[in-house]
Amino acid sequence: MSVNDPIGDMLTRIRNACMARHTTVTMPASKMKIAIADILKREGFIRDYTVIDDGKPYKTISITLKYMPDRRPAITGLRRVSKPGLRVYTKRADIPRVRGGLGLSILSTPKGVLADHEAWRARVGGEVLCYVW
């Protein structure tokens, strides 16, 4: 199946798995998806992720979701910002704050895929990929 927006597909799979209270979700892997999963793990939104290379022509990524003690998902919401039909770019000074700083913006910058506070410290702007809260 051809997917026009692989990042949007990744976010939708994570959102649906959280709503269904699944423990893991798998999807085709790419460098961008692995970088996003790494940021989500560092920021505490997911428990872990693994890249699976089982000899097929493509790799898959398995994300272990994180839940609170009362079984509420750690990820309350995900929103794709920059889409293939409408790219959204921001300067360093205009990096958006999500939910008053409780959420996270993920940006694709010249220095790689970074969280909003990392991009601020690195003094770079870039394409706003998504918001997570």
UniProtKB/Swiss-Prot annotation:
Classification via InterPro entries: Ribosomal_uS8, Ribosomal_uS8_sf
A Gene Ontology term for the protein's cellular component: ribosome
Keywords: Ribonucleoprotein, Ribosomal protein, RNA-binding, rRNA-binding
Gene Ontology BP terms: translation
Any one GO molecular function term: rRNA binding
Function: One of the primary rRNA binding proteins, it binds directly to 16S rRNA central domain where it helps coordinate assembly of the platform of the 30S subunit.
HAMAP family assigned: Ribosomal_uS8_B
Assembly information from the UniProt record: Part of the 30S ribosomal subunit. Contacts proteins S5 and S12.
UniProt family annotation: Belongs to the universal ribosomal protein uS8 family.
Name of the protein in its database record: Small ribosomal subunit protein uS8
Protein species of origin: Chloroflexus aggregans (strain MD-66 / DSM 9485)
Phylogenetic placement of the source organism: Bacteria, Bacillati, Chloroflexota, Chloroflexia, Chloroflexales
Gene name linked to the record: rpsH
